[in-house]
Amino acid sequence: MNLASSKAFKGLAVGSLALAISGVATIPASFAAESTPVASQSTDARTITDKAMAKITQGLPGQFQVAYSKKTNKIWVAGTADRDKHVSTIARIDANSLKIEAVAELPIVKNDKGYQYDAAYGITVDDVDGTVWVTNTTDNSVSVYDQATMQQVWTTAGIAETDPNWIEHPRSVLVDHESGKAFVTGRFFVSAIDLKTKQVEKIQLEGAPDGGTRYISMNLFLDGGKLYVPERTGGKVFVINTKTFKTEQVIQTRGENSSVEVRPSDVTIDHSENEIYVSSQGVDGVNSGISVYDLTTGAFKKFVKFGTQALALEHDEDRDLVYVTDFGTGKVAVFDGRADEVIGEVEMNGAAANDVTLLKDGSVLVLDKKDCDEKVTLPYVLNGTTGEITTASEYTTLPGKDRQGNDVPASVQQLKANSILKFKVGLKDTDVSAAPVGITPTSLDFAGYPPVTGV
């Protein structure tokens, strides 16, 4: 029975990827212009029938990434609202009500510019150890927090740049207890942190531009002993064995126009469809969308246009659905993996739909980075001069210089929140494909920000 067409095989591990000389099966760069797409094996068509459960509410200023704990049914959000890192936290949110239960008081660092937070950007949940891992991207460090107390329990902050455990510009992090490692993307390398010893091993993505010396994308995907890493500048997806930490396969991504960069951003897989899905930002709207590849061979199957800067994606294996954010339009695509087509588009705020995660009941949780009109009052605003934390609706920037080298004086800025979207769609089979169903969420009352927790 064919794995790609049988739902009886849902969740079954796919066989090992074939290895070529030197242990890497590579899809050549010329493949992007010359290869003929493999026809999709699934012709199932579905449409959205129930779109009532779509709610949007106020979130944090400066939202970056979102993570979800299935064990506690809590959502975790990392938010940093300003470049000077005077407004930053991680928040724990109830997945049912979307009420913000707690915001952490992050560690404060003093340097020659004054005081700043050890700011949070990337985030992931470790339900085995009851922790949350956070990337402090602009401080070149990674930290771990206790889920219950929200206190920092480990960090790489403060280690020297010459230390082999130093990670430059960490962006995304995922914890894998099967291999005993936490994987981190950053500049130059993908890093693996040993969960017991905290020692760091690094790998450059061979075949990426400049020998893999540029920034790696903000997203990673783990499955069955494989780490899938999209590399934006080279347009490739690297498949890394999590135990050996060696590249086993390289897939050259494709879009609608082979003369324009694809810029892959995120990746996921579907075992029952035997497919890899990759979101890509493209350039000026060209090559923005979802590309589909055969999971076993890496062969290109189809490109589906969506938005103007398709960014993050999340997969629901049980229903063969993929959810894709578009930073350009602020919409979220509901992509049907059985038919390989977009069947729904959920509105947010007109721009900057950013990160997405799937809840255990099949609901989808999305963050944007678009500021709402009204200013908000936060309990964790740091004074960069005194180091004092206050409840405020404004913050003061540090003086600096613009890109032309001109002096920019300090200024007072209003705090404005981003939004959180939650939705779930109902489905039914249909004989023919139809235009995507548009979904507009209703507003959910915001319950306010709680006092800060931990230190």
Predicted segments — roles?
Residues 14-24:
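Bacterial N-terminal signal peptides
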Residues 4-7, 26-455:
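Predominantly soluble domains enriched in secretory-pathway, periplasmic, or organellar proteins
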Residues 2-15:
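Bacterial N-terminal signal peptides that target proteins for export
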